[in-house]
Amino acid sequence: MDAIKKKMQAMKLEKDNAMDRADTLEQQNKEANIRAEKTEEEIRITHKKMQQVENELDQVQEQLSLANTKLEEKEKALQNAEGEVAALNRRIQLLEEDLERSEERLNTATTKLAEASQAADESERMRKVLENRSLSDEERMDALENQLKEARFLAEEADRKYDEVARKLAMVEADLERAEERAETGESKIVELEEELRVVGNNLKSLEVSEEKANQREEAYKEQIKTLANKLKAAEARAEFAERSVQKLQKEVDRLEDELVNEKEKYKSITDELDQTFSELSGY
């Protein structure tokens, strides 16, 4: 009987222990389920974050691609602008060469004008010599006086025309000086523009430059190129005007030289007639 009681007590104790272990295992199972649910939630959150990061990465890559495209466009615009500046430099160089040629023609015209003035002085001296000669033949004297009056009128007219030519030459020289000053101003503007191009090029190489500022610099740069082109056109127009003025002046000088030649021929004719008259008077 005692053995049965002991056995029952042992079985009861074992039952209690089994129940305790079952409770413990159940609690552990609950805790494991809670941890599993928590882990699954963390996994879902992690997947969500990964998806968000992937989306953000796609957006960043798209923005980077767009920024690279805009940068390439800016670099192309910069290359085009540099090409325009190089073309402007070449045109300004050609304009300077035209100005130099115009100055050479102006110097030639000035030299010819001086020679024509000397010829006019010589004609005036000859006129005075002829005027001071005394003639015994009254009719011949009257004819010579009329011819001298005509020659004096032609000489005065030539002097007036030479004065007009000199005035036109002075105007052309002033126009050329102004054109040279504007050309020098254009060169200074080009130097400033090249410096600004260098700064713009350095700024465009950095992706940190905002699109708004880059567009503002591009618009300012285009405006400066437009202003420089307008100034270049104005300088070219002035150079063309100076060239036409020099050509017109050259024609005027040539015409005056022809008139001087004709006047000299008239003086020679008068001198020949005077010599013939003196010979005839001496023969009497």
Curated annotation (Swiss-Prot):
Q: Which UniProt keywords apply?
A: Allergen, Coiled coil, Repeat
Residue spans of biased composition, Basic and acidic residues class:
12-39
Residue spans making up a coiled coil are 1-284
Map out region (Disordered) in residue numbers: 1-39
Pfam families (alphabetical) = Tropomyosin
Task: Identify the domain of life.
Answer: Eukaryota
Among its keywords, does the record have Oxidoreductase?
no
Which InterPro entries did the record assign? Tropomyosin (IPR000533)
Q: Print the domain comment field.
A: The molecule is in a coiled coil structure that is formed by 2 polypeptide chains. The sequence exhibits a prominent seven-residues periodicity.
Role description: Tropomyosin, in association with the troponin complex, plays a central role in the calcium dependent regulation of muscle contraction.
Q: How does it assemble?
A: Homodimer.
Could you say which protein family the record assigns here? Belongs to the tropomyosin family.
Its protein name is Tropomyosin
- Organism this protein belongs to: Homarus americanus (American lobster)
- The gene designation is TM1
